[in-house]
């Protein structure tokens, strides 16, 4: 029997607030909690024999990119790895791949942010945002990804909007468009479309 890929699910920067409280401080929103779509996906994949990691960056909403990189450097990533990144986590994965030159099986970006997010005058800037988004993602990254890049978006996402469009020609990405998922908050309990894309 063929060995399953290992999967890394990476959260975003959790800038969202609920009743004035940062989402990152709500236990349900821990990426490993089975009550949200990321933890649910991890559980489903593990039941099917995948090795899955949902790493957590400490104080993520104010963490420098170097803290993300240090965490990613500790993970097992090889040509059988599937990387999944939400929002800023998607950008962090692309930047890290660009810097390390590692090859992976597949990359799935969910509501991906890009360096263009810093150009939005209406949003509150996160700490170290300019430094976080300092790397230019180029089309040469495609050579490090064996299968097609997949981007999952929701039509009603008000956080990154259409920012994903720059990645489509750059990475020859296929887009999966969903309805009523917003910015894929961890208040969403399941994301079967992601589970399906990982297993393809």
Residue ranges of model-derived segments:
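Conserved alpha/beta-hydrolase "acid-adjacent" motif
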Residues: 157-163, 186
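Gly/Ala-rich beta-loop-alpha elbow adjacent to hydrolase catalytic centers
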Residues: 84-94
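Active-site nucleophile loop of the alpha/beta-hydrolase fold
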Residues: 12-13, 57, 108-117
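Catalytic histidine-centered segment of alpha/beta-hydrolase-like enzymes
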Residues: 63, 181-192
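Short, surface-exposed "cap/lid" segments of acyl-processing enzymes
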Residues: 2-47
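Flexible "cap/lid" loop of the alpha/beta hydrolase fold
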Residues: 102, 112-139
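Short beta-strand/loop motif that positions the catalytic acidic residue
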Residues: 145, 150-153
């Amino acid at each position: 029997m063929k060995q399953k890929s290992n999967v890394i699910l990476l959260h975003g920067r959790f800038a969202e607030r609920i009743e004035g409280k940062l989402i990152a401080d709500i236990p349900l929103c821990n990426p490993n909690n089975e009550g949200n779509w990321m933890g649910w996906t991890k559980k489903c994949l593990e039941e099917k024999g995948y090795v899955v990691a949902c790493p957590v960056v400490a104080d993520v909403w104010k963490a420098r990119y170097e803290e993300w990189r240090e965490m990613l450097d500790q993970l097992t990533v090889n040509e059988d790895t599937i990387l999944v990144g939400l929002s800023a986590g998607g950008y962090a994965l692309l930047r890290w791949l660009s810097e390390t030159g590692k090859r992976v099986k597949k990359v799935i970006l969910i509501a991906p942010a890009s360096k263009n997010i810093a150009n939005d005058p209406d949003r509150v800037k996160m700490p170290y945002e300019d430094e976080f988004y300092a790397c230019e993602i180029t089309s040469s990254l495609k050579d490090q990804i064996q299968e097609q890049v997949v981007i999952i978006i929701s039509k009603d996402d008000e956080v990154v909007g259409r920012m994903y469009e720059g990645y489509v020609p750059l990475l020859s990405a296929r887009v999966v468009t969903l309805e009523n998922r917003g910015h894929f908050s961890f208040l969403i309990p399941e994301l079967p479309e992601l589970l399906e894309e990982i297993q393809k």
